[in-house]
Design a protein with these regions (language model features):
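ATP/Mg2+ or Mg2+-diphosphate-binding catalytic cores
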Residues: 5, 285-343
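Active-site activation/catalytic loop segments of kinase-like enzymes and analogous catalytic loops
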Residues: 227-269, 282-299
């Protein structure tokens, strides 16, 4: 029975890709080479003539995110550091799915090659990344209540964690105090379009040049929220690597990335409360993971560390502490509870 259903699905997708190809003969030609790519969990993907990628959203639950990616492409038509969008459809009139046709890019993810680069090459790559981010961030969005957004993400997760008895009484006091600082640190006026999933698996490298991929998580948010994933990857590069590339990740290779970002995109790190804001983002991110895996002590420690940064009595700025290693050293000196401002 399962085999029969599977065969029906294969036949259906074969008919759909043939219809898409037929509708786009001016792009593909009359007898194109079609190869199915076995990647992606929510999309079915085909390589056409080794020049184009047809991405079909076969999961209705992912349609909102898929449309985000199409909108992202349409907002960045002149950005040569992302693939080109040739065609897209969300009307389901002729094809019963959302789909897009984009440029196939050559190369490998940065995770595959970062460890082989000299420091000069790494600086050039981050310069290109900064150029790509600047172009993306030139799309200005309307202001909304960012503090409330983060509070509404954090609090239900925190309640779950308390119900699971993850934190002791002293840790809860720390988290409560850090939460009280959200209003102070999260006020934002600089809302732009961001990629929102920037790590090295989503940056492709070929012959000295990079291109960004995977825009389904894109959103309008404060500019520094672009650093949420990126800064976390810099600190723990193995967390975002595939099984194949994890063996190449050495945190020492990532030490200077924030310094290069400051050099080539100073506006991205200009918020005086950057460390506190990134720490709040960490609290939300790791708390979401922790309530799913309450047995993992490392996730709990990550939440607590973020709360300690937010709760520091002597506030730190990016000018004081620029690299993850410097932040760890600073926190090791200021780790006692005397650093919490109880006034």
């Amino acid at each position: 029975m399962y085999a029969l259903i599977k065969n029906e699905e294969v036949t259906k997708m074969h008919e759909i890709i043939n219809k898409i190809v037929q509708q786009n003969q001016s792009l593909f030609g009359t007898n194109p080479k079609i190869d199915k790519i076995n990647i992606g969990f929510t999309n079915t993907i085909y390589n056409i003539n080794d020049l184009y990628i047809v991405k079909i959203c076969t999961d209705e639950d992912n349609e909102k995110e898929f449309k985000k990616e199409i909108d992202f492409y349409n907002s960045n038509k002149n950005n040569n550091l992302i693939p080109k969008l040739y065609c897209s459809s969300i009307n389901k009139k002729d094809v019963p799915y959302f789909y897009e046709i984009i440029e196939k890019i050559d190369g490998v993810s940065l995770y595959n090659v970062w460890h082989t680069f000299s420091e000069e090459q790494r600086e050039d790559i981050i310069k290109q990344l900064c150029d790509a981010m600047k172009q993306i961030h030139s799309n200005i969005g309307e202001k909304y209540d960012w503090t409330k957004t983060m509070q509404e993400k954090f609090m239900p997760l925190y309640i779950q964690a308390k119900n699971l008895n993850i934190f002791n009484e002293e840790e809860q006091k720390l988290l409560d105090y850090a939460y009280s600082k959200f209003n102070k640190y999260l006020d934002s006026n600089d809302f732009v379009l961001i990629h929102n999933d920037l790590h090295f698996d989503n940056i492709f490298y070929n012959d000295g040049k990079i291109k960004l991929i995977d825009f389904e998580r894109s959103m309008y948010a404060p500019r520094d929220f672009e650093l949420d994933i990126l800064y976390r990857m810099i600190r723990k590069p193995w967390k975002f690597a595939s099984e194949e590339t994890e063996r190449y990740t050495d945190s020492g290779d990532y030490t200077n990335i924030m310094l290069y970002i400051e050099k080539y995109y100073p506006e991205l790190v200009s918020n005086p409360n950057l460390h506190q804001r990134l720490a709040i983002y960490d609290m939300v991110y790791f708390l979401e993971q922790l309530v799913k895996h309450p047995e993992l002590e490392e996730l709990k420690n990550d939440v607590i560390f973020g709360a300690k940064v937010v709760a520091l009595k002597d506030e730190i700025t990016f000018n004081d502490v620029k690299t993850p290693m410097e932040l760890m050293d600073f926190m090791n000196v200021n780790i006692e509870y005397g650093w919490i401002d109880n006034q």
